[in-house]
Amino acid sequence: MGKFINTATGTISPDQLGRTLIHEHVFVEYGGPSADCLPSGRKFSAIAARCAGFGKGIRTYGVATVVDPTTVDLGRNPLLLAEVAARTGLTIICATGIYSTGAYMKIRRELGGGIDAVSELFIQELTEGIDDTRIKAGIIKVVTGHPVIIEEERELLLAAARASVATGAPIITHTEGVLGVEQQKILGDAGVPPHRIIIGHSCLSRDFDYHQRIVRGDSYVAFDRFGMPDMPDETRAASLQKLLDAGYASRLMVSHDSVWYWANGPSIGTGAYKNWVPTNFFERVIPMLRFGGATDEQFETMLTENPRRFFAGGTPQ
C-alpha cells in the first residue's frame, strides 16, 4: 500500500482522497445477546438512509473521504459502508483490527496461535477481503486503555505491526489520552515507520509536552473527538491551537469519533450529544480556531494534505 488505498468501493490513489475526516463510525453495535451486527432487508436500507444523511451533511463542507476504524467486534459492516458510499459519493476506508483487546487476545493465546493468528487475520482482510465481501480493509486499528499497556494489548500491537510491515498498511490507534508514546515505541521497535502511525484520541490530553513527544517522534496526532460531551470543544481547540502555533500543523489530523447509527446506543445530534455530529468541526470548531489565529492553509493541511501524505507513506514535513 502507499501507491493505492483500499476503500469500501475499490482502490484509489492518495491524491484522490481530498478532504478527509480521519476517525468516524458509520455503524456501531457492541456484541452481546441483543447484537444485530449484520442488518438486512428493510432494516439495512433504513440504517443506510440515516447514515447517508450524515454523509451528505459533510459533503456540503467539501469532505470527500471518511476513515471508519470500526472493528469486527464493534459491528463492522463493510457492505453497509459500501452502500453509504454509493448513496453519498463519499470514499469510506474501513479497518481491520480488534477493540476488545484483553478478552480477544487472551482467548486467542489459549486456543493457540496468538500473535501469529491475529496478524494473519489482519493480513487476509487487507489483501484478500473481509469475509466473503471482497471489500478490503485499508488501515489497521489497535487499542490500549490505561494506566499501562497490558500484555494482551502489547500482543495486539505486535500483531498489527507484523501485518503493517507485511502489507504496507498504516495504523490508527485508540488511546485514553495517554500511552501514545508507548504505542509509538512498541510499534516502531517492531518495524513500523512512525509516520505510518496516527495516535488517536490525543485530544483527551491537555498536555502539550505529551503531544510534542509524539510529533517529534514523527507520528501523527489526531484531535478526533470534537463534539463529544466529555470535554468542551473550547478546551480541545485551545490545545490544538497551541500545536498549530508551535508549527506542528503538518502532524495533525481532525475528526469527531461520531457514530452515525449506534444500535441500542445514543442518537447523535440530540441532547447531550447535540454537537457530536460529523459537521461540528466545520460549523463550530473552525470559527473558534480562526478566532485564535488559525488559517485556512492550516485547516487544509490538517484535512487534506496530512491524510494524503499519511496514506501515501510520506514523511511529515
Language-model features: locations:
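Mid-to-C-terminal alpha-helical segments outside catalytic/metal-binding sites
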Residues: 2-10, 278-317
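Alpha-helical scaffold segments that flank or form the walls of functional sites
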Residues: 18-91, 116-135
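Divalent metal-coordination and catalytic microenvironments
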Residues: 23, 66, 98, 164, ...
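Active-site glycine- and acidic-residue-rich loops that bind
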Residues: 72, 200-205, 224-243
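Distinct, well-ordered alpha-helical segments
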Residues: 81, 150-155, 178-191, 207-215
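Active-site gating/metal-coordination segments in enzymes
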Residues: 83-86, 91-166, 220, 225-230
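Glycine-enriched alpha-helix->loop->beta-strand junction motifs that scaffold or abut catalytic
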Residues: 89-90, 167-168, 188-196, 213-222, ...
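Short acidic/histidine-rich active-site segments
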Residues: 174, 224-225, 248-272
